[in-house]
Amino acid sequence: LDRTQRIEHPLQVGKLNRAVSSHLEPGGKGINVSRAIKALGGSSIALGFSAGTNGRIMKDMLTAADIHHDFVDIAGQLRVNTQIIDAQGGHTEVNEPGNKLDDSDFLRLLDRMENYLDEGNIFVLSGSTPPEFPLKNYRKLCKTIKKHGCKLIIDAQGELLQEALRCEPDFVKPNIFELAEAVGDKPSAD
């Protein structure tokens, strides 16, 4: 979940900052992909993990927005990423850690994916993975998608991007910093 809070003054670290507004919405790169597809008149199914009360809130919000989803419920609580915006437009972000997965959680995700692995379907793997998520599992996701004749789009960075490139995705969407990191260069201001 993404929480945006607005304050009327510059953020004062170590002091009470009262928000004048607060907004909660489903968040994460994958959810944003589904929202964009919906806004363009298409349909998608958001897959991934959900946890606890926050997970139920997210699923209810997605259902209300007519965004289809099929999440694997896991132990713990879905993380909330908080953004504080001050009157001058300054942004401060605080991102909670995600939940660790056990092997059975990952296997349940693979089983859930089986329902959607029809040739020609498009899968977007975007964002970060849960803490301590093995690269071999990310590779397995990529290979499973490609093996079934589905299109694979990657929006990742670092080791995840490197691992995904080995699976020959159909499209990769790195930003300038992710691309520079992938090729061992520094982004230029040009």
Q: Where are the regions a protein language model picked out?
A:
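Cofactor-binding loop segments of dinucleotide-utilizing enzymes, especially the Rossmann-like FAD-
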Residues: L1, F49-G52, I74, A87, ...
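Positively charged, low-complexity intrinsically disordered leader regions
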Residues: L1-V13
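Substrate-binding N-lobe of the ribokinase-like
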Residues: R18-L78
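Conserved phosphate-binding/catalytic loop of the ribokinase/pfkB sugar-kinase fold
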Residues: I84-E119
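Short beta-strands and strand-loop turn motifs
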Residues: E93-N95, G120-S128, D155, K173-I176
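Short, small-residue-enriched loops and turns at beta-alpha junctions
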Residues: N99-D102, T129-F133, L160-Q162, E181
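Short acidic/histidine-rich motifs immediately flanking catalytic phosphotransfer sites
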Residues: L117-I122, E168
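Conserved phosphate/ATP/ADP-binding segment of small-molecule kinases
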Residues: K136-D190
